[in-house]
Amino acid sequence: MRDPQNIAEVSALGIDLMGFIFWPKSPRYVSQISSRAGIIPDRVNDDMLDGRKADVKYVGVFVDDMPQNIVTRVYNFKLDYVQLHGNESAVMIDNLKATLIPDIAPDIKIIKALSIREADDVKRWREYEGHADMLLFDTKCKCVGGSGEQFDWSVLEGYDGNIPFLLSGGIGPDDVERVKAFKHPMCVGIDLNSKFETEPAVKDVEKLRAFIDKIR
C-alpha cells in the first residue's frame, strides 16, 4: 500500500491491519521523501497518512533490515506493528523492542513471519516464544513473500504454541470456503495480498469488499 486514495478506500472496508513493504527489492516498496541532507532524516509523504482510520493498525514489513531503518519508519509512519520477514533472531527482536519501548513506540508489537512447506517448518515457532507478539505463517518459496502460492494448511494442526498467528500465502477471492473451514485456536486473522491487487501495492477494492463480506 502506498497510494493515498487506495489506502483510504481500503481502510474504509473494516479491515484490522494494513501493511507497508519497506524491503527495497520488492515491487511494493514504500519509499520515503529524501531530505537530501545527511544530517536530516528522510520523511514520509503525509498524504499517505491522511486517510488513516483510528481502528486500522499499520504494519511495516522488513527483511533483514538495519535496526535504525526500522526505528525511523516506525516513527515516521506511526507503525503499530513491525513484521520481520527475513532471518531475524529472537535477540534482534528483543533489542529492537528495547530501542522502541517506551520512548519511541510504547505499544509496538512484533510479528515474525515463518516460511512453511512442511510440518517441521512450523516447529521454528519455539525460537520466538517470549519474543515475538505474533507469528505469520507464509508459503516457503525462493522469493520473500507475495508469491501468490499456498502451502498445505493442515501442517498447522501441529502448531501447539501460545503465540497468536496470521494465516498467509496466496489467499485469493476463490478461497472463501477454505478460509471459513480453517480452524485453529491461535489463528487471529488472515493476510490478503497479491491475489487482491490490480498492480503491485494497489489493492482491488471491490474484490476485497466482496471477500470480506463473505468471510464475515
Regions found by a protein language model. Name each.
Residues 1-216:
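Conserved N-terminal beta1-alpha1 strand-loop-helix module at the mouth
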